[in-house]
Amino acid sequence: MPAIRPFRALRFVPEAVGDLATVVAPPYDVLSADDRARLRASNPANVVRLDAPTEEPGDADDDRYRRAARTLAAWRSDGTLHKDPRNSIYVHEQTYRVPGTDVERTQRGFFGRLRLEPLERGSGVLPHERTLAAPKEDRYRLLRATGVNTSPVIGLYDDPSGRAGTIL
């Protein structure tokens, strides 16, 4: 069974950013260039500036990652982001409309810290898809520059007894 632990999250400060809906974004790998531009325009503190930094004309190899790191430092300094004082498990709920329908769904889960172990150790965490070299390199370079995970790894869990659902 995977060991899930609490952690101290960096969170947007609502008083600094306004409506939290304007600072969130879909996963970086589903965003088009137009999506990124729209999100950047929606709020100067939209997370896309950290999670999917764009290349600017004249950029050297790692400039966009360094720019994300500078943005992160500025947001921490000016109060846009705040690091929680205590380790926590963060409950998450997101309601959305299924594209092209009037159907509304709610996704519930949590954010926690999980140690990644090699598969052969039997950690209980199974691979979910084939991963490609370029996106892995991109995420590694962003992590190396910023020192933070800017987007979660999404996992599914089996809960036949409903225990996790009751807790959430």
Regions found by a protein language model. Give the residues of each.
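A cross-family signal for N-terminal binding/gating loops and helix N-caps
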Residues: 1-168
